[in-house]
């Protein structure tokens, strides 16, 4: 199995932090300084925002379904 020779070209050597400052713009530096939190499968929202904007079932049961049934039965009674 052939091995590749180490890179001797200075342009292919890994950069130091001092060298990166000239290459990276302010957005790249911000993204490196503030990494994303692991477990961010929440559409880019925090847990609090996701909880506030999520349709959760109400603990009281199916109020909307019961209300619709009641309204429909009242309409049928009015037609008779």
Curated annotation (Swiss-Prot):
Coiled coil: none annotated. The gene is Nupr1. GO terms for cellular component: cytoplasm; intercellular bridge; nucleoplasm; nucleus; perinuclear region of cytoplasm; protein-DNA complex. It comes from Mus musculus (Mouse). Highly expressed in pancreas and both ovaries and testes. Transmembrane segments: none annotated. Transcription regulator that converts stress signals into a program of gene expression that empowers cells with resistance to the stress induced by a change in their microenvironment. Thereby participates in the regulation of many processes namely cell-cycle, apoptosis, autophagy and DNA repair responses. Controls cell cycle progression and protects cells from genotoxic stress induced by doxorubicin through the complex formation with TP53 and EP300 that binds CDKN1A promoter leading to transcriptional induction of CDKN1A. Its main location: nucleus. Phosphorylated. Phosphorylation promotes DNA-binding activity. This is Nuclear protein 1.
């Amino acid at each position: 199995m052939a091995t590749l020779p180490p890179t001797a070209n200075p342009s292919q050597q890994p950069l130091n932090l001092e060298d990166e400052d000239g290459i990276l713009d302010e957005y790249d530096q911000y993204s490196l300084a503030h990494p994303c939190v692991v477990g961010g499968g929440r559409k880019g929202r925090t847990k609090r925002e996701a909880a506030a904007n999520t349709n959760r079932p109400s603990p009281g049961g199916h109020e909307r379904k019961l209300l619709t049934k009641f309204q429909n039965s009242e309409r049928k009674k009015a037609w008779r």
